C-alpha cells in the first residue's frame, strides 16, 4: 500500500503542478487503490436535491483544492459556489459539457472508477494543454488504453447509500510487443431499496478501449456508457418530516397492491465513443486530435392529474396547518372548528405510513370510474424526455519552444441536437386521454383552437408511449479557437491564455401550439453570439518554500440554450434582451511548503454581469404553469480559502481546511413571464438583490487526522457546514406582487422576505483500510463511514415554494390563506450514518 492515506490521494492523483503544462503520458500509471477514484452520489449528480452538479476539482499543490471536493461532497459542495457550467470537462482533449445546460453529467461515467482515475486537473488560473481554463477550473480525462494501470482488478462492495451492492471488474493489458493496448471495465450497482425509502437503483457501467502505436503516431478508440434506472427522492416541508417522524420522508412513492411504487423514476443512458489521434511530430511538438460523439437518453416520470384533486400525499391542502393557523396571527383561522380539523388531519396522517404516501389503488379506481363515463384519465404518469445527439472535433498542437516555455494552439467545433418531448408513460387503468391544454380551458372556450397543444392534430387521442403536451428540438452549433503560452525564468513563472468562439442556436417545434399558432411549429430564427476572453497568471518563488501567485481574467460567455428560450414548451420566442455574460475573475494566493507543512491561503473575487436565469413553476393561484426569465442580473463571488497539512510523524498527518465565501446577486433583475393559460407576456422587476447562491455551504471547515503505516490507513474527519441557502422563488419578489400586498415602506422601498436558509452543523466521517501483498497481487479491505454521529438535522438543500400566502379574488383584491407557503420551504436533510465496505483484489 502506498505511504499516503488513500482519502488524501483521492483528489491528488494525476494532477497538474501549479502553472505547469500537462502532457498526456502513454505509460501505465502506478497502481492506486480504487477507492481513490470513486465518485460520490452527489458528484455523479444522482442526488435529487441538486439543481446543479457539484464541482469535481483538484490540484497537486493546493492543500485546500486537493481535499474539499470529496470531503464536502455529502453537502453537495460546489467550488466557490460557482455553477458547474463554469467547470469545463474534457475527455482526451474534447469538450463534453452539455451544450444546452452547460454542465457535465458525471453520471455518464459513473462506475468507471479505474477509467476516470486518469485525469489532469487545472485550477482557474493554472495552464493546461486542452483549453483556456474555466472560472471554476477544468478537468481532462485520459481514456487512452495504454495510460491505464496494467492488470486485472476485481472488487465487491456493500453499502447503505443510493445503492447497496456493487461489483466491478477491470482489465488493462498495457502495450504488447506489437504496440497494442486493450482495456475493459464492467460495473454493476444495485439496490432494491436505497437509503431513502421508496428509492431503488439499477446501473450497469461498461468501458471498452483499444490503442495502437504506429511509430510516432497513436490511434485510440474507446466506447462507454452507464445505463441507469433509479427511483428518486422528493423534498418535503418540516411539517411533513414531523408527521412522519423521519427526516428522510419521501412523498414520491406509495403502495400499489401492497408493493412500493415510485412515481419519479429516472432512466439515463449516454452511450459515447471517441477516436483519438496522437502525433509526436518531433521531440518538441505534438498534435492531438479527437472526434467524440454521444447520444444522451434521459427520461423522468411524474404523476399528474386532470380535472381531479392533487394526488401528492404532501399536498398542502391535506396538511394540518392548512386548517388551523399555527403561526398565530390570523384569528379567523384559529376557531374551535379549525382546531378540530387540524386534529383530524394530524391523526389521519400520523396514524399510518400508507396515509402519508401515494394511494395508487385509489387512482386506478378513480380512472376506472372516469372510463366508465367516457371521460379522460383523471390521473396518469407522464414522462419528460431530454435527449441529445452530440458530435465534436477537437485538435491541439503543443510545442515546447524552449526548455522553459510551452505554447498550445487548439480548436474545437461541436454540433448538438436536443430532443425534448413528453410522453404518456402509464394511464393508470384509464382508456382515453386527449392532447388538450386543460389548464387553458376556462380562460378559453373548450372548443377554441387556443386549448390545442397541436393544431396539426387537434384533439388527438393519447395512448401509452404517445407524445403530448410539447415536442421540440434545440439545435446548437459551437466553435472555439484558443491558445496559451507559459514560461518560467528564474524565480518567475507566468502564463497567458485567450480564446474566441461562436455559438448559434435555434428551436424547431414539432407541435403547433394553439396559443401560438404562428410561432410554435417549425424552426425559429437563429440567435448568434460571439464569445471570447483572456487570462493571465503569474507566480514568484520567494525561496524557502514560499510562492506568491496572482491571476486575472475576463470573458464574454454565451448564454446556454437552456436559458435562451422564454417558453420552449410553447413557442419559438427567445428571452428578451438575451446577451453574453461578462465575467471578471481574480485570485491572489500564497503557498508555503516544507518537509513538515504544506499550506495554501487564497483570496478570490469574481463578478458576472448580464446573467440570465430561467425557471418554470406551477402557479397555483391561476392553475397555470409560469415560464420565467430573469435578465440583466449581476452577481459577485468572493471569499477566502485556507488549507494546511501538517506531517506530525512519518505515519501521521493533520490537516485543516476551510472557506468563508460570499456568492450573491448585487442587482435586481428584469423578469418576463408567460402563463400557460393565457399566452401573453408580462414584464416586471424582480427584487432579488442580495439573494445568495443555493444548494451549497458558503462556510465550510474540516479538521482531520490521517494514519498510514504497514499497509493500514485510518482517516478521521470532522466537518462543519453553515450558510446553506435554499433556492429562491422569483414570484415572491415581483415588484407588482409586493405592491399588491403593501410590502413597501414609507419611502417606497420594497419589503422583501429574506431568503430561506437551511440549518448547518457538524458531521464526523471516518475510514479504515488494510492492504495485504500476496504472492500474486494485492488484497485490500476498506470501510468508509459518513456521518458517524447520525446528525440528520443538517439541511443539504431545498427551495421556496412558488405560491403566495394569499389568494386573489375575482375583483382583484387579496385574501390571506391559512397555509403559509412562505413559512414552508421544501427541504432535503442530510443522510444519517451511512457507509461502504469494499474488498478488492488486484493481480
Language-model-detected regions and their locations in the chain:
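C-terminal beta-signal and adjacent terminal beta-strands/loops
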Residues: 21, 654, 720-742, 770-843
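Short acidic/polar hinge/loop motifs at secondary-structure boundaries
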Residues: 57, 63-67, 94-125, 142-144, ...
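Transmembrane beta-barrel wall of Gram-negative outer-membrane proteins
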Residues: 158-191, 195-233, 263-284, 537
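Acidic/polar loop-and-plug regions of large Gram-negative outer-membrane beta-barrel proteins
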Residues: 211-213, 218-276, 299-382, 446-462, ...
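Surface-exposed extracellular loop regions of Gram-negative outer-membrane beta-barrel proteins
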Residues: 229-231, 235-236, 240, 451-452, ...
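Outer-membrane beta-barrel signature, preferentially recognizing the C-terminal barrel domain
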Residues: 249-272, 276, 524-533, 541, ...
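Signature of Gram-negative outer-membrane beta-barrel scaffolds
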Residues: 380, 406-543, 563, 568, ...
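Gram-negative outer-membrane beta-barrel transporters
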Residues: 605-607, 628-732, 838-842
Amino acid at each position: 500500500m502506498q505511504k499516503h492515506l488513500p482519502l488524501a490521494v483521492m483528489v491528488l492523483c494525476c494532477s497538474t503542478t501549479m502553472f505547469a503544462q500537462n502532457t498526456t503520458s502513454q505509460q501505465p500509471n502506478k497502481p492506486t487503490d480504487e477507492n481513490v477514484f470513486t465518485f460520490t452520489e452527489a458528484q455523479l449528480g444522482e442526488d435529487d436535491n441538486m439543481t446543479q452538479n457539484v464541482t469535481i476539482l483538484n490540484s497537486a499543490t493546493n492543500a485546500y483544492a486537493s481535499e474539499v471536493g470529496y470531503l464536502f461532497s455529502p453537502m453537495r459542495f460546489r467550488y466557490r459556489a460557482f455553477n458547474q457550467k463554469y467547470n469545463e470537462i474534457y475527455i482526451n482533449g474534447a469538450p463534453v459539457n452539455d451544450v444546452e445546460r452547460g454542465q457535465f453529467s458525471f453520471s455518464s461515467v459513473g462506475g468507471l472508477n479505474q477509467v476516470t482515475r486518469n485525469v489532469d486537473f487545472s485550477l482557474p488560473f493554472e495552464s493546461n494543454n486542452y483549453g483556456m481554463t474555466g472560472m471554476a477550473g477544468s478537468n481532462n480525462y485520459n481514456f487512452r488504453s495504454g495510460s491505464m494501470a496494467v492488470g486485472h482488478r476485481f472488487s465487491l462492495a456493500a453499502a447503505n447509500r443510493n445503492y447497496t451492492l456493487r461489483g466491478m471488474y477491470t482489465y488493462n493489458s498495457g502495450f504488447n510487443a506489437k504496440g497494442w493496448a486493450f482495456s475493459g471495465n464492467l460495473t454493476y450497482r444495485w439496490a432494491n431499496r436505497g437509503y431513502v425509502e421508496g428509492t431503488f437503483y439499477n446501473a450497469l457501467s461498461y468501458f471498452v478501449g483499444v490503442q495502437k502505436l504506429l511509430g510516432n503516431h497513436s490511434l485510440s478508440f474507446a466506447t462507454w456508457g452507464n445505463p441507469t434506472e433509479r427511483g428518486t427522492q422528493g423534498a418535503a416541508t418540516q411539517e411533513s418530516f414531523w408527521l412522519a417522524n423521519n427526516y428522510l420522508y419521501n412523498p414520491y412513492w406509495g403502495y400499489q397492491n401492497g408493493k412500493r411504487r415510485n412515481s419519479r423514476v429516472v432512466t439515463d443512458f449516454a452511450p459515447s465513443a471517441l477516436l483519438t489521434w496522437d502525433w509526436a511530430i518531433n521531440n518538441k511538438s505534438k498534435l492531438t486530435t479527437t472526434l467524440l460523439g454521444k447520444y444522451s437518453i434521459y427520461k423522468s416520470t411524474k404523476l399528474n392529474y386532470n380535472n381531479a384533486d392533487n394526488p401528492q400525499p404532501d399536498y398542502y391542502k391535506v396538511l394540518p396547518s392548512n386548517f388551523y393557523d399555527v403561526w398565530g396571527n390570523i384569528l379567523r383561522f384559529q376557531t374551535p372548528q379549525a382546531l378540530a380539523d387540524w386534529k383530524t388531519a394530524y391523526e389521519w396522517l400520523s396514524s399510518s405510513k400508507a396515509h402519508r404516501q401515494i394511494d395508487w389503488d385509489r387512482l386506478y379506481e378513480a380512472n376506472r370510474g372516469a372510463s366508465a363515463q367516457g371521460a379522460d384519465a383523471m390521473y396518469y404518469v407522464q414522462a419528460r424526455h431530454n435527449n441529445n445527439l452530440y458530435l465534436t472535433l477537437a485538435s491541439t498542437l503543443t510545442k515546447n519552444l524552449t526548455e522553459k516555455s510551452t505554447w498550445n494552439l487548439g480548436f474545437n467545433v461541436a454540433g448538438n441536437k436536443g430532443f425534448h418531448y413528453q410522453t404518456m408513460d402509464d394511464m393508470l387503468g384509464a382508456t382515453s386521454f386527449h392532447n388538450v391544454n386543460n389548464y387553458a380551458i376556462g380562460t378559453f372556450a373548450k372548443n377554441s383552437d387556443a386549448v390545442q397543444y397541436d393544431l396539426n392534430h387537434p384533439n388527438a387521442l393519447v395512448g401509452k408511449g404517445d407524445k403530448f403536451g410539447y415536442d421540440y428540438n434545440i439545435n446548437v452549433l459551437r466553435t472555439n479557437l484558443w491558445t496559451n503560452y507559459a514560461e518560467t525564468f528564474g524565480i518567475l513563472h507566468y502564463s497567458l491564455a485567450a480564446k474566441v468562439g461562436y455559438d448559434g442556436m435555434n428551436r424547431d417545434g414539432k407541435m403547433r401550439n394553439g396559443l401560438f399558432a404562428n410561432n410554435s411549429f417549425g424552426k425559429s430564427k437563429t440567435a448568434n453570439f460571439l464569445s471570447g476572453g483572456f487570462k493571465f497568471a503569474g507566480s514568484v518563488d520567494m525561496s524557502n518554500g514560499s510562492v506568491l501567485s496572482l491571476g486575472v481574467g475576463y470573458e464574454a460567455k454565451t448564454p446556454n440554450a437552456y436559458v435562451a428560450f422564454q417558453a420552449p414548451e410553447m413557442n419559438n420566442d427567445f428571452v428578451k434582451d438575451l446577451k453574453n455574460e461578462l465575467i471578471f475573475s481574480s485570485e491572489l494566493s500564497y503557498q508555503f511548503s516544507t518537509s513538515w507543512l504544506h499550506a495554501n491561503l487564497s483570496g478570490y473575487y469574481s463578478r458576472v454581469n448580464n446573467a440570465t436565469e430561467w425557471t418554470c413553476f406551477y402557479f397555483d393561484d391561476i392553475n397555470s404553469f409560469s415560464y420565467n426569465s430573469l435578465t440583466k442580473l449581476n452577481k459577485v463571488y468572493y471569499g477566502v480559502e485556507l488549507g494546511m497539512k501538517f506531517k506530525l510523524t512519518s505515519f501521521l498527518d493533520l490537516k485543516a481546511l476551510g472557506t468563508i465565501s460570499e456568492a450573491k446577486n448585487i442587482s435586481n433583475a428584469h423578469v418576463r413571464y408567460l402563463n400557460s393559460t393565457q399566452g401573453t407576456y408580462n414584464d416586471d422587476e424582480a427584487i432579488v438583490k442580495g439573494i445568495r447562491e443555493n444548494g451549497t455551504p458558503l462556510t465550510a471547515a474540516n479538521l482531520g487526522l490521517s494514519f498510514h503505516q504497514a499497509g493500514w490507513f485510518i482517516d478521521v474527519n470532522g466537518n462543519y457546514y453553515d450558510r446553506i441557502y435554499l433556492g429562491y422563488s422569483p414570484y415572491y419578489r415581483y415588484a407588482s406582487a409586493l405592491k399588491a400586498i403593501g410590502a413597501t415602506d414609507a419611502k417606497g422601498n420594497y419589503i422583501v422576505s429574506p431568503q430561506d436558509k437551511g440549518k448547518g452543523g457538524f458531521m464526523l466521517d471516518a475510514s479504515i483500510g488494510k492492504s495485504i501483498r500476496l504472492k500474486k497481487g494485492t488484497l485490500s479491505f476498506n470501510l468508509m463511514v459518513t456521518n458517524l454521529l447520525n446528525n440528520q438535522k443538517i439541511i443539504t438543500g431545498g427551495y421556496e415554494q412558488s405560491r403566495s400566502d394569499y389568494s386573489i379574488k375575482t375583483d382583484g383584491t387579496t385574501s390571506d390563506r391559512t397555509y403559509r407557503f412562505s413559512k414552508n420551504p421544501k427541504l432535503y436533510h442530510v443522510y444519517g450514518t451511512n457507509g461502504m465496505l469494499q474488498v478488492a483484489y488486484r493481480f
